[in-house]
Swiss-Prot record:
It comes from Homo sapiens (Human). Belongs to the small GTPase superfamily. Rho family. Changing residue 32 to F: Abolishes AMPylation by Haemophilus IbpA. A lipid is attached at residue 189 (S-geranylgeranyl cysteine). Changing residue 188 to A: Decreased palmitoylation by the V.cholerae toxin RtxA. There is a cross-link at residues 147, 166 (Glycyl lysine isopeptide (Lys-Gly) (interchain with G-Cter in ubiquitin)). This is Ras-related C3 botulinum toxin substrate 1. The effector region mediates interaction with DEF6. Changing residue 17 to N: Constitutively inactivated. Abolishes interaction with PARD6 proteins. No effect on NR3C2 transcriptional activity. No interaction with PPP5C. Doesn't activate PPP5C phosphatase activity and translocate PPP5C to the plasma membrane.
């Protein structure tokens, strides 16, 4: 059985741990608990192939900036997460997470994941953002960011309702099992 190491990164409180707990136990956890590395392992079937999916949680807080990369070696796929209702966490995909991941693992596939999908249409959440002159992140914005950072896929999910949750991990596995073809630059020799 093929083993795949999937590391989840992103700002603190975007829902990385909830994503993993909800996926592995089918239950949404209660209050917020900041993480320092938890590992989960799940045997799953994707496209008829059995896979041992090793899920590595990380702490997004700056205090762990020097410790976090210790979990990066031998990673097969990264999930870079941001909250759809936190524009700051979305901006940090470009400013922090993509550069950090690429620095340590230049060729590892990335899946960009927008979390807390259930809150994007939540009236109270929209109102709180509006007070700060902010709005939730839209699907096209997420897609554009994924293209900008060269992510294999852009996906949105809710750990609370589990909408889109299984797809995130299925696509992470597919990114490893069926990597997209590398576009070769055609070298043309021009004589003038």
């Amino acid at each position: 059985m093929q083993a795949i190491k999937c590391v989840v990164v992103g700002d603190g409180a975007v829902g990385k741990t909830c994503l993993l707990i909800s996926y592995t136990t089918n239950a949404f956890p209660g209050e917020y608990i900041p993480t320092v590395f938890d590992n989960y392992s799940a045997n799953v079937m994707v496209d008829g192939k059995p896979v041992n999916l090793g899920l590595w949680d990380t702490a997004g807080q700056e205090d762990y900036d020097r410790l976090r990369p210790l979990s990066y070696p031998q990673t097969d796929v990264f999930l870079i997460c941001f909250s759809l209702v936190s524009p700051a966490s979305f901006e940090n995909v470009r400013a922090k997470w993509y550069p950090e991941v690429r620095h340590h693992c230049p060729n590892t596939p990335i899946i960009l994941v927008g979390t807390k999908l259930d809150l994007r249409d939540d009236k109270d959440t929209i109102e709180k953002l509006k007070e700060k002159k902010l709005t939730p992140i839209t699907y096209p914005q997420g897609l554009a960011m994924a293209k900008e950072i060269g992510a294999v896929k852009y996906l949105e999910c809710s750990a609370l309702t589990q909408r889109g949750l299984k797809t995130v991990f299925d696509e992470a596995i597919r990114a490893v099992l069926c990597p997209p073809p590398v576009k070769k630059r055609k070298r043309k020799c021009l004589l003038l």
